[in-house]
Amino acid sequence: MKTICFYFQIHQPFRLKRYRFFDIGNDHYYYDDFQNEEIIHRIAEQCYLPANRTILEMIKTSGGKFKVAFSISGVALEQMEIYTPEVIDSFKELAATGNVEFLSETYAHSLSSLGDPEEFKHQVKKQEDKIKTLFGVKPKVFRNTELIYSDDISAMVSEMGYKGMLTEGAKHILGWKSPNYMYSSCVAPKLSLLLKNDRFSEDLSNRFSDYSWNEYPLTADKYMSWIAATPDSEQIINLFMNYEVLGSLHPASTGIFEFFKALPRFAADKGISFSTPSEVFTLIKPVDSISVPYPISWVDEERDCSLSLIHISEPTRL
């Protein structure tokens, strides 16, 4: 049976206020509390709360067959606790269904995996503790900032005890291979990998409300027919995207919530199930290993970390 693995990323940075020359030595508080509060309230109303209600309804109306995974950065969770505790409560309600998996990542949605192994491990442990405190579970699956992955990173993640990791299905890495299979790390064979299906993910994240798209409007029936038409041997369709796709990037007026609500029914009609990453790692075996000597990510056309590495290495220009 073909299965869909939905994963949503959630991150909100602590935004910094304008800091003037004459503030140096006089003002030691750097955060823009007004902007932080305004933005997370707006995103909560547009996305987090209505999307969580939609996911909960989908789980209930499907008889528990709809499943999903979230990765919520620690700093985003901190802001929710401060400004929108009702969002935390709604995620706890989802957690109580047993149909939602919370993944681990770096606490600050940082690039520490690219340059500071000790800081990376520290942030991952801090994130584990945050998820355990809020939702009562210890994450078993890892997802790095912007899906950043390399052989070296996979070795660290495996060393920390994770059984699986999510990353980008980059074409220059896969070549002729399909992202719709499970793979493993070539340097840490016990670490299984789920790779993002770019086409199907971006049909939702980028193209859903694009009037110029030749497939507009996209219906749940049409979308599921595309997935059902993939080769029978390709058992996993990994749909990875930002949670703000629901309600913020695509406003409610586009029909995005109604589209999602219809997915379980049309999936069932075509014999397609939904699984969490942990379930997939338990049920399906890797077909091959992949080698990624240089970091990849889901950012930009190149699907690499070139822009991130520029930010790390480039000196500050005055």
Task: Walk through the language-model features, giving the residues of each.
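Alpha-helical scaffolding within the catalytic cores
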Residues: 53-54, 82-95, 174-186, 221-227
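CE4/NodB-like, metal-dependent polysaccharide N-deacetylase domain
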Residues: 119-146, 226-240
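Short, solvent-exposed loop/turn segments at secondary-structure junctions
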Residues: 11-13, 74-78, 107-110, 147-150, ...
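Generic structural signal for well-ordered alpha-helices
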Residues: 52-56, 88-92, 121-131, 154, ...
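Active-site and substrate-binding clefts of carbohydrate-active enzymes
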Residues: 1-46, 181-191, 195-198, 210-213, ...
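Short "domain-exit" segments at the C-terminal end of structured domains
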Residues: 314-318
